């Protein structure tokens, strides 16, 4: 019984030393990229159905955020966690009723030196994100 208690104490000490040093920022950045990609695909489907919704990207000194709006009504506001930046030349992500984007380009989500990218293709309006060997995020 004493061996079991000593073994459990050692395990708790080891876990206590390892867990605080884990950087979850990369996982958060990946999660935000997947969430934003899903939101863009949702907006595209809504615009195909004739609903006039768009995503507006804003950057302040400390935080990045995006807003989902239908004409002038704000539907949703999503702020990026600390140290995660969103950079793009597209300030408004919006699609025609046939699926073509008004502006095509790339949205990048940065955490430290890793870059996660979402690309909106010009003519077809496909929403892609690069992973693995195809991505600049190594």
Describe the residue ranges of each PLM region:
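N-terminal single-pass transmembrane signal-anchor helix
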Residues: 1-22
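N-terminal helix-rich module
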Residues: 17-37, 45, 49-54, 58-138
């Amino acid at each position: 019984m004493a061996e079991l208690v000593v073994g459990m104490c050692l395990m708790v000490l080891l876990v206590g030393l390892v867990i605080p040093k884990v950087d979850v920022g990369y996982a958060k950045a990946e999660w935000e990229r997947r969430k934003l990609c899903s939101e863009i695909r949702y907006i595209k489907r809504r615009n195909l159905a004739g609903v006039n919704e768009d995503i507006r990207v804003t950057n302040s000194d400390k935080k990045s955020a995006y807003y989902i709006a239908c004409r002038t009504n704000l539907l949703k506001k999503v702020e990026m966690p600390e140290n995660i930046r969103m950079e793009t030349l597209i300030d408004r992500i919006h699609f025609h009723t046939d699926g073509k984007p008004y502006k095509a380009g790339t949205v990048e989500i940065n955490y430290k030196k890793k870059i996660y990218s979402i690309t909106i293709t010009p003519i077809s309006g496909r929403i892609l994100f690069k992973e693995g060997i195809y991505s600049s995020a190594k």
